[in-house]
Amino acid sequence: MKKIQTITSAANPVIRFTHALVHTRGRAAKEGLFAVEGVRLAEMAVSSDWNIHHVLVTEQGMNSTRARTLFTQLCAADVPIYSVSDSIFRTISETDAPQGILIVMERKIRDDDTLHEHTYTFGAVAPLYIALDRIQDPGNVSTILRTADAVGISGVIL
């Protein structure tokens, strides 16, 4: 079980890497990673079968019961967790009102055949995908996913 490490400098390599991942176009794809923000998306990330690279959290981000449950699970899974100040977190966050938790996750690498699993025959309905890029409000992702599911979208590409 790993402890939560405190980072106090914006020049720390983890902070610089995460900032570049979130704010430099193409960096996340190049690294095979992506970031999600907010308690709800963090809960979804922890309950998924996707690998978590590392977590940034503020003191405020650890205050809720839901967040403490998340951190217990993350610590048990030996995920690196870094505590940062609100000011450092705001430089990385893309939301107007950050909740104080950001998870960097590994992308699942899929080859072209994966998307073609939904091949169709003449007369059948073609598969339909939604691609999401640089979502401003992480709460919008869950809304988009629920809507996509309701209308029968074949998949969502993050």
Predicted feature locations:
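Residue-level recognition of specific faces of alpha-helices
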Residues: 17-20, 91, 131-134
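Boundary-proximal intrinsically disordered activation/regulatory segments immediately upstream
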Residues: 1-72
